[in-house]
A protein has these predicted regions:
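Glycoside hydrolase catalytic-domain context in secreted enzymes
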Residues: 1-185
């Protein structure tokens, strides 16, 4: 059950009732991680349920912390325009500190996709179309999020997405991608 990952109970549009047995499954050790849990009240509640399982393996909580957690910073594309790697590392560090305080263990950031089409709806999550700048920013943001992983204010960074995800045909998210050598190189 440790590979099962569930979402939280709330979304911006209201309550989510996909799995009414979620709490019982956590107690049984059938869930290993959860996404989009908002605040220490809920992370603590779910963690206490996990400690009632036979093996007492804690849950991992993940959240998209793309440009801040409670403090909102400029979107990654705007930060990239500054070329200020120290500032980007600092904003990731602050976001990690806030997220960790809320019980979040890992973030799905930074996005390292190279944007090819301005119509793509996720351009703002990354550093744009420059591979050199994108690699430098990814390094700075991972360093900011993770710092020293022994520090309670750090969160694990998970770079995303798959190769060529940012080259979706027609700029349509989740669309086909031309992964031929000609297009990738």
């Amino acid at each position: 059950g440790q590979l099962n990952q569930y979402t939280g109970d709330n979304a911006a549009t209201g309550p989510i009732t996909i799995n009414p047995n979620k709490q019982a499954e956590i107690k049984q050790g059938l869930i290993g991680s959860m996404l989009n849990i908002l605040g220490t009240k809920y992370t603590r509640q779910y963690q206490e349920l996990a400690m009632q399982s036979r093996l007492k393996i804690p849950l991992l909580f993940g959240q998209d912390v793309i440009h801040g957690y409670k403090t909102t910073f400029p979107i990654p594309l705007a930060e990239a325009a500054s070329w200020d790697l120290e500032a980007m590392e600092l904003t990731a560090r602050i976001a990690a500190t806030e997220a960790a305080a809320a019980g979040i263990h890992w973030t799905f950031a930074p996005m390292v996709d190279i944007s090819r089409d301005p119509r793509w709806g996720r351009v703002m999550e990354g550093a744009g179309e420059d591979t050199y700048l994108g690699s430098k920013i990814a390094y700075a943001r991972v360093k900011g999020f993770q710092g020293n992983l022994g520090d309670v204010t750090s969160v694990m960074a998970c770079v995303k997405h798959f190769a060529a995800y940012g080259a979706a045909v027609g700029g349509r998210d989740y669309n086909s991608v031309d992964m031929s050598n000609r297009m990738l190189w």
